[in-house]
Structures are given as C-alpha cells and as structure tokens.
UniProtKB/Swiss-Prot annotation:
Residues 25-678 are extracellular. Residues 31-130, 131-239, 240-347, 351-454, 455-563, 569-676 form the Cadherin domain. It is a single-pass type I membrane protein. This is Protocadherin-19. Ca(2+) 5 binds at E141, E200, D231, S232, D234, D267. The chain crosses the membrane at residues 679-699. Keywords: Calcium, Cell adhesion, Cell membrane, Disulfide bond, Glycoprotein, Membrane, Metal-binding, Neurogenesis, Repeat, Signal, Transmembrane, Transmembrane helix. Ca(2+) 12 binds at N448, N450, D480, D482, N486, D537. It comes from Danio rerio.
Amino acid sequence: MHSKDMDFVQMFVCFLLCWTGVDAVFNLKYTVEEELRAGTKIANVTADAKVAGFALGNRQPYLRVISNSEPRWVNLSPAGLLITKQKIDRDAVCRQTPKCFISLEVMSNSMEICVIKIEIIDVNDNAPRFPTNHIDIEISENAAPGTRFPLEGASDPDSGSNGIQTYTITPNDIFGLEIKTRGDGSKIAELVVEKTLDRETQSRYTFELTAEDGGDPPKSGTVQLNIKVIDSNDNNPVFDEPVYTVNVLENSPINTLVIDLNATDPDEGTNGEVVYSFINFVSNLTKQMFKIDPKTGVITVNGVLDHEELHIHEIDVQAKDLGPNSIPAHCKVIVNVIDINDNAPEIKLLSENSEMVEVSENAPLGYVIALVRVSDNDSGANGKVQCRLQGNVPFRLNEFESFSTLLVDGRLDREQRDMYNLTILAEDSGYPPLRSSKSFAVKVTDENDNPPYFTKPHYQAMVLENNVPGAFLLAVSARDPDLGMNGTVSYEIIKSEVRGMSVESYVTVNSNGEIYGVRAFNHEDTRTFEFKVSAKDGGDPPLTSNATVRIVVLDVNDNTPVMTTPPLVNGTAEVSIPKNAGVGYLVTQIKADDYDEGENGRLTYSISEGDMAYFEIDQINGEVRTTKTFGENAKPSYQITVVAHDHGQTSLSASAYIVIYLSPDLNAQEQIGPVNLSLIFIIALGSIAVILFVTMIFVAVKCKRDNKEIRTYNCRVAEYSYGNQKKSSKKKKLSKNDIRLVPRDVEETDKMNVVSCSSLTSSLNYFDYHQQTLPLGCRRSESTFLNVENQNSRNAAPNHGYHHTFTGQGPQQPDLIINGMPLPETENYSIDSSYVNSRAHLIKSTSTFKDMEGNSLKDSGHEESDQTDSEHDVQRGHYADTAVNDVLNMTVPSNNSQIPDQDQSEGFHCQDECRILGHSDRCWMPRVPIPARAKSPEHGRNVIALSIEATTVDVPHYEDCGTTKRTFATFGKDGPDEDRAEQRGRRQTAEPAVCSPKTNGAVREAGNGREAVSPITSPVHLKSPQSKASSTYNTLKCRDAERIANHSLLRQPEGKDSEPAMREINTLLQDGRDKESPGSKRLKDIVL
C-alpha cells in the first residue's frame, strides 16, 4: 500500500485506542510471494500473537477484523487463520513501488489490537514488452556521427531487479546503443550514429532491439527497428551526352518521336525529380515545330516539317531537379529534316463494309469478292503503285489500271477456317518507295455440306429387367460442324421390329438423343435387341447418319421356383415307401424349375420342417433319403416340408408338403436307383483301358515267344549235340582218342569246313556255371569253307567286341580238334601255352558258346517244353561238358564217308515216353556213324584251325535261315527230312547267305589266303541282315552239316566235366611237345 494509506491506518488505530480504551497494540509482519492462489494459508495469527505477547486471557480466543481495514486480498477466520481470498498480483496491488504491503487490524475479545502487515514479494512473472511490433526512425543522411535518437522503451510490470535492466541491438558498424536511467529507475535506450550515412549507398537499415529484465532466469522482449535514411539534395542532374543528333523525315506526323532525352539524378524525392525544358533563347520556329515533355524528356514533332523550308533545327534543352538550390544541366539536340517521298499510296475497299466482306464456302474459283482502289498523290514514279496480298491465303488480286479485284483462288471450307484476315500492301515507285497497307476480314459463310456424325458407331446399354416404363436407358450424341440450322441435329429411331413388334414399342428417343424405355423389359423374353438411330440436320436438303444401339436386358431374380417333381396337388405330394426301408433309401426326388439365370436360377433344396429326424435331402439334386430305419412302432405316415430357394440377391423360394406313407407291401430290395451316367461312363472307360492293357501284354508275350524261338532254334548241330547228353552223372575220362586229326580230303584242299553258327560268339559276361542250355544262333546250321589264310594273318587286331571270325590256316599246319570240335578262342580265353597249362584261366574264361534252354530240347507233347517233364533236370551237365566232350567230337568226314539213314518209324533218340506223349524233334535226328580215324601221312596237316579275330564295327545283322517257323516242338512233324532238305537246298541256292554274322566289314588280304572280318555283335542284339555275306564263304546245305554234327555226337553220348578234361588235355599236350610231331608243332604254333 502507499505511504498515505499507511498513515491513515496509523491515525485510525490511534483513534480507536483513545476512543475504546484498549489495553495494548501489537504488530505482526508476514512476507509472501505474489501469484498465490486463493485459499492459501499465510499464518496462524492466534499462535503468532501468543508468541508476540498478545494475551488472549483464559477465554476461548476470538478475533475479528476491524471493518474499515478489511482488505480484499486476505481473510482472517475467528480462530486466527490468515488465508488469501484470491490470487494476489503484486503488479496490480502496488504497481511500480519498490515495496508492497497490505495491512489489516485485528481486535481480540480481550480488547487488544493487533496490526498485521503482509509484504508482497515480487516474482519475475512478466517479460518486457514493447508497445508495437516495430519502431520506425528517419535519419537524414547529413546526420553527423554521435547524433543520438531516443528510442521508445519497453514496459515490464515487475519491479526491482525483475524489471527491465538493459537494451541491446543487433551488432553493426553504423549505429550504436546507449542505456540511460530515469529518475524513477526505469531504463531507456538511445540510438547513436557512429558513421557517416549515404542514402545513395544504403537507404534503409533494419535491426532487432531487445529489452531484458534482471530476473533469474531473465526474460526479454524484442522489437524490429527500421531506420530510413532521408535524402539531401547533394547531386545535380546529368545528361548522357552533351550533344545529340537525330534525323527526322519531312512531313512527319505530329507527335512523331524525335528523341527521348534522359538526365539522371541519384538524389531521392524532389531532390532527384528532374524536369526538362527548352532554354529561353530557343527560336519560336523551333518551339512551333517541336515540343518536349517536362517529365520524360521526350521531344516530338509538333508541326509540319518541310525540308525545303528548313533542313536543320538546333534545340537547347536544360534539366534540373526540384530540390533546394538546384543546379541545372544542359545539352543540345540537332535535328536534321530528311527529304523523302512523303506521299504514301492510299488503299480503299469498295464494299458495303470496308472492314469485312463475306463469301460462301461453296464459292467457285475466280469468284469476285470485292473491289480495291489504290491512289498516290505523288506524281511521276512516286505516284505509280503496285499491290499484293500478304500471306498464303486462298485469294488473289487481279490488277487493272485504276482498281483491282479480290478473287477466290482456292477451296474454302468454313469448318476448317471461317475467317481470314487479309492485308493488302501497296508500294509506289519512289526512292525510297512508300508503302501502305489495308487490313480487312473475309468471313466464310456456311453451307450444309457436312452430315451429322455420331461420336461412336455402336452404343450399348445394360438395363435390368422389369424396368419402369419411361426410364432413361442411354444417350446418343451426334455432331454437325455446320452452323445454324445446318448444324442443328435431330434424332429418330429407324423403323424395325423386335420379336415381331415395332421397335418404337420398346424404346423412344427425344431431340437430345436421350433414349427411354417405353415398356418394362423381360429378360426371359428378350435378352438383347438392336436398333438404329438416325441423326438428321436442319439443312436443305437435310443430311443424315446412323448408329447402332444395342440394349442388353440383365436378369433380375423375379421368378419364383416352381416345383415340378413330384406332382403336387394343392402344394402336397404323397409318396409311399417300404416299411422295411433302410438308411439311405431313396424316397423321392424333388425337382424345381427357375426361369432366371445364373445365381438367380441356381436352386438349393432343404427340409424346413416336419419329421426331419427321419429324412434328409441332397441340396443339389433334391434326392430325399431316409436317415434311419422305421421300427415296428413306426407311424403309418410322415410329413416333411421341402423348400427350393434360389441364390439371387433377394432369394425366392417355393415349398412342397410331402406325405410319406410306410407300406408293408413294398420291398426295399426292389428299388432301382437313378442311373448315374457319370459312373457308367467311368466304368466303360476303365473297361476299355483294361482290355487294351491285356491286349498289349498278350501281344508283347507272343512277340517275345516268337523272338525266343527265332533265337533258340537255329543251329541243328548244337541241337543234336545237346540231345545226346545223358542225365548220368558218370564222368568219362578224356583219352587220346578224343583228340584226332581231320583228313584233308574234303571238297576243296585250300578251304576248310567250319560249322557257322551265331552261337559261336564271344561274350564279355562272366561264365555262368549254372546255366543248363546252349543258346543257338540260328534255326539251321550251315557249313562254310574259308580260304586258307597265311600264317602272318595271326597278327590280327586284338579282340574288342563280342563276335569273332574263324579263318583257316595253311595246309601244313594242323589244328587241334577236341572231341570233334575246334577249341575256340575268345577275348578272355586264348589258345596259348599259358592258358592251356593254367586251369584257373580256363575256368574263368568266357566261351563263345551260350547254353540254350534245356527245356526246349524235350517236348512233352504240349508243343512247348514242360519243366515238369521227366527229362527236365536243372542239374544237368555244365556247358563245359558239352563244349569239351560232346562238341569237340564233331569232325569233318572225307568225301568217301557215308552217313547211314535212320529209321523213319522210330528215331534213334526215342524213349518210352515218346510212345505215350508223342515224338519230339530230337527223335527224328539221324544217327551218324563214327568215322574212321584218318591214317594219312598228311593227316597232321589237315585239321580245322580256328583263329579268333574281332573288329570293332557296328552290330551285325543275322539273316533268317528259313522262312518257315521252326521250334523243337514242330521240328520233324511238318514233313519228311528229305522234303525239308530239298526246301533248304532251294532256299540256299537262291539265297547263299549263312547264319553266321554278316561280313559288312573289310576283307583283308593275308598271304595266299583271305581273312573275312565280321562285325562285332552280341547274342542279345539280333537284327535283320542289311547285306549279303562275303564271297569268301561257300555255303553247304544245313542237312549235310547236321549229319556231320550228329555223326560226332553219336560217338560221345555223355557229358564231360571241364576240369578233368583240361588236365588230360594238358597231359596230351605235354606228350606232344616231347615227340615234336607235325601236329604237336602246329599245336605249339597255335598256343604260342
């Protein structure tokens, strides 16, 4: 509170003391910060009064505030609590006083007075604030450095150190800031000019002025300080040049620009505003011919210039600013008046409207649009004028003596261009020539030359069925580029029929091309229809064009399903089923029709009510079937309600009430369900597939059997040799008689007889000691003579394949025969000393012979080998037995040897089983007598030599040795041996090929003989031949070869074990080396 208020309080307190006679007066002082919210407790006066000696007596204390001193900021309760009434704002209570107090006087019930003073402590809750957002100061550029300009200060309601303490300005070199303190303690700022100002260099400055208080933390406020430098008239106007020279044509029109003068003054305002004027001593003629604009300095022609009167004008001009003490600037302008052809041609358009002429777009070429007249007041050549049209336009000028005509010179089309701006240029013959121009417009008027055209040739609209008659369907649009009535288009529907009715009964079109439906469409009746719309303009005659409109009527779910099966009577159908019907029994099938399409017509069936526990329905096909059996206590009838509803967006449905009677007379087994065509179709396809599969298997088996017969029954020698083997396990020792020399008295002395058979092949497979049969290479055997080969031919290429070629050696080199058969040489088994002396090599070697199926050697009468036959023995002698004991006994007889014929009624090989089961092929094989051993001196040289050679070539092809299919089951049963021999002879005469591999390879010369090298083959690759045999082979009849082979087989009926045989062979070979006989010498050569 102010001091005056405090004095009044003290005086009032003294008055109370004197008037009431109080006992004592006490003082209490409190200090609080401003901005306390209402209801804040300041102190407990009762407690503080006791401390201060304020005796309240023994009575209950009671305090009251004297009414004249009650403040509006605080409140004292009777119990002595001092509380704020409202938020205390020191700045509102005490303004700018250094200290702020509020006081109140309190009287107790003991008549004692207490004076309470509350000091309000200032809080820095206000930031300095400037009265405006910017401060503008104008300073003359003549202001000297050190000049001060007071600035408007900021205000801060806070006091003391929380008030404004300082001002700052944006740092710069031109102005500074000085802070001063007033008498009331407030701070003010003064702007100080520190450097000379130049407005022409910089006319404005902008800084930021900041006021900051002393609070903690301090608060601040800012304002923008704008300083404008005021100009002073310290510059004079200056012209660009002191003298200007210009040329002006005579008869130049008034206001023709002569020159634009420019004098600059860098001062501002009136100090820089320049005015122009002629100097007072300029002649009056010059002032009449020319004038100058005081503000712009533009000199223009003010009269008629005539070169003949005065051809030079000198004009003196001055320029000065409007500032005080202005100093003017001067310049001189020299004007030369140029003599010229000063009369230009004049052009006039002789038409009703000199600015525009009209022409129809159908105007023909040469059509006259307007007349043009051109004149020139000059005489002579200066008055002779030529005219032309400017630009590329479909017009031309036709010039005559005194006028010209404007003609159409091209096709006009208003739709392309409806207006032409023409300019006629006229030029006289003066020097320089004068030109003039005349511009006018040519408007092309419209003709009805364009028919309307639709924006597209086909329109389509989709509308839902059951539309409201008169509903908008679509709009067609046609355009006509013509104007007026020629471009006004009207529409109409071309007459046609839709389902036998006029199309106008379906749709209509208005003048704007909007098509509306006349009737409600039905998708089920009319799904789509087309019609044509004609667009016609208003020309005379009118032009038309057409467009096709297609209306597609979309389906709406507007058809309720209709029950068709079973037949309903008043919505009810009765069905009878057997009482003993089981689960899944077909009661009936519900069928309904819906004429809608898609989802609107797809129906689903369901049972909505009734005896649903006993029946169920297929949602798709509507079959009603039982779900449980009916017992003895079943009702006589059951009822269900079947509903068929479609799948439209708003589903429609139909229901049927089905009464199902249980009849004991019907039998549940008599039901024949509906035919499932899909199942029948699948079963039929499966049956066809099975039949085809079985047929393929049958054909494959038959082909395999035929191939087996072709591969198996082709060499009779092997067939006879195997047939003479006995089941006896008794082994016969090899004697010297088993090795014999073959006499040389055969048909040709330089050839030897070799049984050619595809079974004499070399295989890279390991030797199978459990194979029981000898596979034969062809169905009949033939003997082939080979030319004698020189000894040097033994150095042939090594074996690289499966097949070998047998070649003869020289006549002086006998070969080794074991049991009538030459010992073969394979790629793993060679006839040399190491192999002969090594048992292990012989056992591990691979033979050129392959066992044939033993089952095929015995016929049980069932046309094929029967493995259950008594002759079938899987433990029969091994291939080595046949190869060493039986096959080696086959020798080549001389020409004088006779082979006796066998009994035709019963063969030599017949057994008791033949009388019961029938004869087999082996029964008809003739018995060949054992030939006498040759004692000729040359016996040692005439032997069969087998030389194993191989050449790596393509797989050979075997030729079928007979056209008649032969097996062991049919051999000897299709005719006598003589007939078969004749047939074979005829075949061999016409076809001299052999069964051995075809010699597609080269035939190499070697000494006096020739070596036929056969291609490599494998027993498993038997193909048809590609070429005939080499001429090196001479073929014998198979019958002769069979007799020779059989003759040897009869001498050795039993098999021979390979190991004992080889031991005996080694012994014999050792004996032969000691004697050095020709035969042993030949054997040594073979072995080496």
